[in-house]
């Protein structure tokens, strides 16, 4: 009888452990994955392309949560912009918009570095989605270079001006291979953001 009770106790513990494991299963999580594709063109020829994951900042994730679940409204027009940077820096979770702009940690590229578009960063132009993926693949961020520099990476921020060191840095990516560009080279950046439960 004691052996049967012990067996039943063991089974009960196993069932409870399984229940707790299932309760904490992958479907109760929401994870954002950022995939960045970088293209470097010269004279109409694709010189280099790479795709990799980026770092979502704490500041950026807080912005998402506040728009979705709190009281921060989202602009009716573009809210995110793509920028590129020329300092040898690896994006970190604690990075903020204060590291962008002219002369700050990221060394954001300015009009002297790329002159199309002038003044402002290109908009992150997406389309309505009915899936868990949003991307600017049909309207890639396009930069026409104006100088011989090395481009180290790209980012998403919510301020339009290249000089802006305010607002939110959503995410950033240091390229696996920094690119030495010259005047009239073209850079295209595609950001794909996936929301998943795993």
PLM ranges: what are they?
Residues 1-152, 158-198:
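Small cysteine-rich, disulfide-bonded extracellular modules of the LU/uPAR three-finger superfamily
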């Amino acid at each position: 009888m004691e052996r049967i009770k012990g067996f039943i106790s063991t089974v009960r513990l196993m069932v409870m452990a399984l229940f707790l494991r299932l309760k904490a299963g992958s479907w109760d999580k929401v994870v954002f994955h950022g995939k960045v594709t970088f293209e470097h063109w010269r004279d109409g020829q694709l010189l280099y392309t790479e795709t990799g994951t980026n770092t979502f900042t704490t500041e950026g994730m807080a912005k998402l949560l506040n728009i979705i679940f709190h009281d921060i409204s989202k602009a009716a027009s573009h809210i995110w912009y793509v920028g590129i940077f020329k300092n040898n820096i690896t994006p970190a979770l604690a990075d903020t918009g204060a590291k962008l702009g002219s002369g700050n940690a990221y060394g954001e590229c300015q009009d002297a570095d790329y002159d199309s578009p002038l003044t402002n960063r290109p908009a992150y132009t997406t389309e309505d989605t009915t899936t868990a993926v949003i991307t600017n693949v049909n309207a890639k961020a396009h930069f026409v270079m104006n100088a011989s520099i090395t481009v180290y990476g790209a980012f998403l921020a919510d301020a339009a001006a290249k000089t802006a060191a305010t607002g939110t840095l959503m995410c950033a990516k240091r390229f696996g291979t920094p690119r030495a560009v010259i005047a009239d080279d073209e850079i295209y950046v595609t950001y794909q953001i996936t929301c998943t439960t795993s």
